[in-house]
């Protein structure tokens, strides 16, 4: 069976603002199955942003677990992320899940991987997915050379990724926190 491929998720933190955005394309083999998927969401009463890349079903499973961890730790993003990563790495069924998450609250941005990694990105920029390297490079250049707010940086970075990565489109969902 073919795998679902691709997406681009990027987060930019500047000053007291953070933006997290993603494209809407879901690809199966060489066919675009959907162009309007919503891979960026607000959770925990709108206080936490989360974006996911990888297998859609796996990502939703992880998203549900992450929300439960946030409730358990009363919104403490770091503790919830570390606990999820620990479960993800040690649980035999979870270990097979193929997805990555970027999470952000008003203070912290984290990348959570299936290897058990919880990464605090340097420079306030994080990106995952098939177009992640393009988006991260573009965001880094924009942050270092402009005064654009995070939402605009995310939009421009996603646009560049969409022009270069065949698994990324230009139908964006961007969420922000101040």
UniProtKB/Swiss-Prot annotation:
Protease subunit of a proteasome-like degradation complex believed to be a general protein degrading machinery. Its EC number is 3.4.25.2. The active site is at 7. This is ATP-dependent protease subunit HslV. It holds the Pfam family Proteasome. It is found in: Cytoplasm. One of its GO terms (molecular function) is metal ion binding. Coiled coil: none annotated. Belongs to the peptidase T1B family. HslV subfamily. The keyword Protease applies. It comes from Cupriavidus metallidurans (strain ATCC 43123 / DSM 2839 / NBRC 102507 / CH34) (Ralstonia metallidurans). It catalyses: ATP-dependent cleavage of peptide bonds with broad specificity. Allosterically activated by HslU binding. It comes from the Bacteria. GO terms for cellular component: HslUV protease complex; proteasome core complex. GO terms for biological process: proteolysis involved in protein catabolic process. Na(+) binds at residues 162, 165, 168. Keywords: Allosteric enzyme, Cytoplasm, Hydrolase, Metal-binding, Protease, Sodium, Threonine protease. The keyword Endoplasmic reticulum does not apply. InterPro entries: ATP-dep_Prtase_HsIV_su (IPR022281), Ntn_hydrolases_N (IPR029055), Proteasome_sua/b (IPR001353), Proteasome_suB-type (IPR023333). A double ring-shaped homohexamer of HslV is capped on each side by a ring-shaped HslU homohexamer. The assembly of the HslU/HslV complex is dependent on binding of ATP. The gene is hslV.
